[in-house]
Amino acid sequence: MHQYGYFYIMTNVHNTVLYCGATTDLYKRIQEHKNKIFKDSFTLKYNIDKLVYFESFSIAGDAFEREKQIKAGSRRKKIELIVRLNPEWKDLSELLKANEGEELIRIKRLFK
């Protein structure tokens, strides 16, 4: 079975703290953040539960490489990515469905 990968950026309600991550199951991972599954996590500590940016990859490993690349960059670069895709910093998790893959690629194209 083919496994897609996703790089994502989340923030808090005030858009002051940014969190970058990568996963093979974006819907599930975002729900874990929103439901505060990991009790000692950065996202819980800073109340990060709003998905503001994501990229989809046809190869999962590419998403994890992208995460490393973006994490190494400046906050300004992260904000530029977000603003280009999502200028109003809306919570994109509202658009996600449990069926990923091609659906998420289609959603991402809507924001270009």
Predicted regions mapped to residue ranges:
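GIY-YIG nuclease catalytic motif and its immediate N-terminal context
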Residues: 1-38, 44-54, 65-68, 85-87, ...
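Residues at or immediately preceding the N-termini of alpha-helices
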Residues: 26, 59-61, 75
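Short arginine-rich
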Residues: 68-82
